[in-house]
């Protein structure tokens, strides 16, 4: 069995008048591919945000392996306007390394997704915006992509 990277245990989110979900357990290990399925409003996006560390549960716990990186790709990505796509994607690198190397990685990732790194982020189609968001999520080579 692979070593867990993320674990949610007995997790629940309360909306005040009702529980969105309760008693949820999820373990993500290296190489796992998981699919969340449920009706609208069941809490799938909320659960993903919890796993990414972007929210707080009302009960339960989240554990992540020390030093792992997590990228979160939201359902409807919001990209900054008026920037080159390379600059948008470089925001995904975290800016903690060599600027030149990060720029090359951003450009390579955009090229992989058939996008022009010099193109401005204004006026992208929905599909193009989605590909830019995916490039931004993948450029830092995360251990977990949500």
Where do the protein language model's features map onto the residues?
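ABC ATP-binding cassette signature C-motif
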Residues: 1-146
């Amino acid at each position: 069995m692979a070593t867990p990277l993320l674990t949610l245990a007995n997790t629940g989110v309360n909306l005040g008048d009702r529980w969105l979900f309760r008693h949820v357990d999820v373990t993500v290990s290296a190489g796992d591919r998981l699919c969340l399925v449920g009706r609208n409003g069941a809490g799938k996006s909320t659960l993903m945000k919890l796993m990414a560390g972007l929210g707080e549960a009302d009960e339960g716990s989240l554990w992540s392996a020390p030093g792992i990186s997590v990228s979160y790709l939201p359902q409807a990505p919001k990209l900054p306007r008026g920037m080159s796509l390379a600059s948008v994607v470089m925001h995904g690198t975290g800016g903690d390394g060599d600027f030149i190397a990060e720029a090359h990685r951003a450009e390579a990732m955009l090229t992989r997704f058939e996008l022009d790194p010099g193109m401005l982020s204004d006026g992208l189609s929905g599909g193009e915006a989605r590909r830019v968001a995916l490039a931004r999520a993948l450029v830092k080579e995360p251990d977990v992509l949500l």
